[in-house]
Amino acid sequence: MSDKFIKFFKQLILPFLFFPILLVSQSGVKEYSKDIALYEAKFFIISEILGPSLDYDKFVIDPLAASKSSEITSIFYDGKNKKGLVLGFFDDFWVQDSRSSNFKGYSFKNIEYEKAIQLLNKIESIIENEKKFLNADDNENNIYFNFEEMVFLIYREGPLRGRIRISWNNFDGEWENTAFRRTKRRFEKSIN
């Protein structure tokens, strides 16, 4: 091969061989979805909520809604005379150790049936009763409350962009207003 060809190959062709690798490595797409939450939540519900079964037991789970950011997924469960709402968190979380590191991971929070109804109604009530306050100044007027080890922050960011942020167990996830309303509607439908 001539020196010209080798030089041409190095300058023009070789970078194109690495181009797909650069594209893949720069992808910021989250790899979590409602389907994965459903898959992972099954064993969480069995081991942490329903408990062991020597013979066999049946249970139902329904993935209610996932926020577009995939940070929070809501799942209804019913089995062994227990029912409720599981919130799945997926995002970066902070571990305060000697290095103070950030990791990507997931975790689930169980909210028993009565408490779930209480929580969903409280959020809806705050949004309805404080609409004027929340709409007055985007991203400036905020409402917060604590519920079962979680901190809820409600605010607006732009027209028709209600936000609900939940901080729990080193996760900080956003539950979009649309996903919240879908969760509430489908949760109420699932219990009938």
What are these regions (language model features)?
Residues 1-31:
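Bacterial Sec-dependent N-terminal signal peptides
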Residues 25-192:
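Positively charged, low-complexity terminal tracts
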